[in-house]
Amino acid sequence: MDKVVATAAEAVADIANGSSLAVGGFGLCGIPEALIAALVDSGVTDLETVSNNCGIDGVGLGLLLQHKRIRRTVSSYVGENKEFARQFLAGELEVELTPQGTLAERLRAGGMGIPAFYTPAGVGTQVADGGLPWRYDASGGVAVVSPAKETREFDGVTYVLERGIRTDFALVHAWQGDRHGNLMYRHAAANFNPECASAGRITIAEVEHLVEPGEIDPATVHTPGVFVHRVVHVPNPAKKIERETVRQ
């Protein structure tokens, strides 16, 4: 089945207000910028995003934040986005902070049909005990806090129960993809993309290099086409650098 659509706008056209999105990438590496830009242009709002971080100001998911399109986010590292911090502290954005490895496993588990799993990460902290601020009110008071989670002991070690994540849509960026949706990621751009691709009920992939079925060595496929519903060819995407260090 040919899953290629002509434009990013066409690919995201049915993402409605209030949808949940799993978005791949780490920092500015491997993020689906064309799909995010198309979402901004579509006017969709009240979104819930699941992503390692929310980009930086005006880039990646930071673009959706800039236009105030995100209602809630499940994230791990968010310290590089000033607008994110402003919206969170002003009570405009709900934030569920999750340990990075736990977030990756929650996405992977959701995609594999695993409803929940136990992990030692977060035991003895507000991650497990509850009380972590999720939303502030306009005056700076805490309006919503995280609930306490179930804990259980195995072989003398305490673990906390974490739930798998499934989202309405997933947006991912791949280096190479074929018309059947088989994807290959390149180097660090693989971060969170495979997990997000499996977690979405409808997964949309933007690919730098579009090839015909059979051209990708099956042994190098990172996300099989069974997980992917739409493919958009986005050649020569901008390669933004989050932090540049040069020798004096």
From Swiss-Prot:
Disulfide bonds: none annotated. It comes from the Bacteria. It catalyses: a 3-oxo acid + succinyl-CoA = a 3-oxoacyl-CoA + succinate. CoA binds at residues 24-30. It is an enzyme of class 2 (transferase). Its EC number is 2.8.3.5. GO terms for molecular function: succinyl-CoA:3-oxo-acid CoA-transferase activity. SMART domains: CoA_trans (SM00882). Keywords: Transferase. PANTHER family: ACETATE COA-TRANSFERASE SUBUNIT ALPHA, KETOACID-COENZYME A TRANSFERASE. Belongs to the 3-oxoacid CoA-transferase subunit A family. This is Probable succinyl-CoA:3-ketoacid coenzyme A transferase subunit A. The lineage of its organism: Bacteria, Bacillati, Actinomycetota, Actinomycetes, Mycobacteriales. The gene is scoA.
